[in-house]
Regions:
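N-terminal first-folded block
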Residues: 3-45
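Absolute protein N-terminus
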Residues: 1-2, 110
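Feature captures the catalytic cores and cofactor-binding loops of soluble hydro-lyases/lyases
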Residues: 23, 32-46, 50-110
């Protein structure tokens, strides 16, 4: 499934624009601990996290994630959005909880 298809399935917005829309997603990972994310996120994943600071971009780049998904319509600072665009990292935002987004992604990828 591509990122564009996933966005339609889980009803979220791409706050960084059309970055990575054609990339294939293999799996997902949910964690708010950066060290846990670094240790466990697989390549070609989407990462669901409530963290919204600049360091999430370093983790996403290191692990080559397709997108970061922010739950509960939480706001992301413009400086983080701008840096994500510069680095080619997609950030999505959904109104659902992290649990609900995880379930939607899991079911969409099955």
């Amino acid at each position: 499934m591509t990122l564009a298809e996933l966005i339609g399935n889980i009803r979220c917005e791409a706050i960084t624009g059309d970055i990575n829309m054609d990339r294939e997603i293999r799996t997902g990972y949910t964690s708010d601990l950066l060290s846990d994310a670094i240790a466990n996120i697989e390549e070609d994943s989407v990462w669901i996290t409530m963290q919204r600071h600049i360091n999430i971009l370093g983790v996403a780049k290191l692990k080559d994630v397709v997108a970061i998904v922010i739950p509960r319509s939480l706001q992301v600072e413009q400086s983080v959005i701008d840096k994500a665009r510069e680095e080619g990292i997609a950030i999505l935002r959904g109104s659902q909880t992290a649990f609900e987004i995880s379930a939607l992604i899991y079911n969409a990828l099955r």
